């Protein structure tokens, strides 16, 4: 997702209630079909046609083929409202966010999804080093295993945000981001329909029905697609064919979704057998507050945080479930109002794997929710290292086997936070 996180910064994320995975392909979502006023639609069409001409020229795709896929494209007024930033009186609420995603219905669906895909999850875990609980947690938080994948046509979403983003301070930058995503969508759908890139000015071999179906598939109001909610650029860069049928289908194929999430996390630096985050010690809260700057960058060593009383010595010891004292970390601040409306903050120390989750969705709330969802499913948030690095004769497991993430036999399912 080329940093899918950045593309979804404007949206906390889609999610809703949970459902059993067996229902994921049966749930039909009504596609929103709106249109703007005539003047706005005219400007929209002019800008869209210019982009199509640009793609046609740069990729040598017949312009008529592109235009036929966008003849009914619309600017959707409600999308512009959905991406507006919250009002000035809005207060971030970690506890409310957590309650929304780490709840019994979603967890039950997660366990069912795990059971239905246990063998493949185990396979992906071995290949990528990403625990099954983490993968199940991400898909559960994103779409409840396919139940909530959005109800807008993706071409309408990306076209709307590319050419009529709301008047915000970052309007120009956001429009450029979505123009890029719209181009990525076109190229994704062209190749999915059998086309070559560059196309050499021919549509030979292209299934026009599949091209249109790809452009018209449902998405979130930010243009994210399928069970794992990948942006088009992320699909092209990180999605993989998990079920081996020769195509990538993140909406209908759980295996494609599972393998793609594992691949994304691996490429973005997931460290197998390492924890995600540590809670800040009560005596270190004041020090953590001073270091919290909202920037997801590994900047302090674990030893520095131990010296400040933010972490314990055990958290800097691999043999005790911690990490190397030279490992880098950063402070995660999760604000919430208490029952009296007074601002409070819960602090964690984010490690490398926390940062990897942030690459998936640039939100501390999201990343900590994934971690806690996974824990609720049985994930152990501690390092997994050999008990005795020097002893080989007394232990039946090899060092290479031990270096692998824990298997699902010791897990109960991904946890929701």
Residue map of PLM features:
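Sec-dependent signal peptide recognition
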Residues: 2-11
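Acidic/His-rich structured neighborhood in mature extracellular/periplasmic domains
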Residues: 94-260
């Amino acid at each position: 997702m080329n940093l899918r996180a950045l593309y979804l910064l404007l949206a906390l994320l889609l999610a809703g209630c949970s459902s059993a995975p067996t229902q994921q392909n049966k749930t039909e979502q009504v596609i929103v079909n709106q249109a703007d006023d005539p003047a706005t639609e005219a400007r929209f069409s002019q800008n869209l046609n210019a982009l199509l001409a640009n793609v046609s020229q740069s990729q040598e795709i017949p312009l008529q083929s592109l235009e036929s896929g966008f003849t009914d494209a619309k600017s959707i007024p409600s999308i512009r409202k959905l991406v507006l930033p919250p009002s000035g009186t809005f207060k971030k609420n970690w506890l409310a966010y957590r309650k929304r995603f780490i709840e019994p219905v979603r967890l039950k669906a997660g366990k069912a999804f795990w059971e239905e895909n246990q063998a493949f999850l185990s396979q992906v875990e071995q290949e990528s080093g990403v625990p099954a609980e983490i993968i199940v947690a991400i898909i559960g938080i994103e779409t409840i295993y396919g139940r909530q994948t959005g109800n807008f046509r993706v071409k309408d979403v990306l076209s709307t945000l590319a050419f009529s983003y709301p008047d915000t301070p970052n309007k120009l930058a956001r429009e450029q981001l979505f123009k890029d995503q719209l181009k990525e969508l076109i190229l994704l759908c062209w190749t999915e329909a059998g086309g070559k890139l560059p196309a050499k000015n021919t549509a030979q071999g292209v299934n026009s029905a599949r091209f249109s179906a790809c452009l018209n598939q449902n998405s979130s109001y930010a243009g994210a697609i399928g069970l794992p909610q990948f942006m088009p650029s992320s699909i092209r860069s990180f999605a993989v064919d998990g079920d081996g049928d020769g195509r990538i289908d993140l909406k209908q194929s759980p295996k494609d979704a599972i393998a793609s999430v594992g691949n994304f996390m691996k490429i973005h630096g997931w460290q197998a057998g390492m924890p995600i985050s540590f809670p800040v010690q009560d005596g270190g809260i004041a020090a953590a507050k001073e270091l919290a700057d909202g920037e997801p960058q590994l900047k302090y060593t674990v030893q520095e945080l131990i010296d400040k009383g933010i972490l314990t010595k055990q958290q800097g010891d691999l043999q005790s479930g911690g990490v190397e004292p030279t490992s880098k970390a950063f402070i995660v601040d999760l604000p919430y109002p208490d029952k009296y409306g007074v601002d409070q903050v819960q602090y964690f120390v984010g490690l490398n794997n926390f940062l990897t989750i942030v690459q998936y969705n640039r939100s501390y709330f999201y990343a900590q929710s994934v971690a806690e969802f996974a824990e609720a499913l049985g994930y152990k948030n501690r390092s997994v290292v050999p008990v005795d690095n020097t002893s080989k004769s007394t232990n039946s497991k090899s060092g290479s086997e031990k270096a692998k993430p824990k298997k699902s036999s010791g897990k109960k399912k991904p946890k929701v936070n």
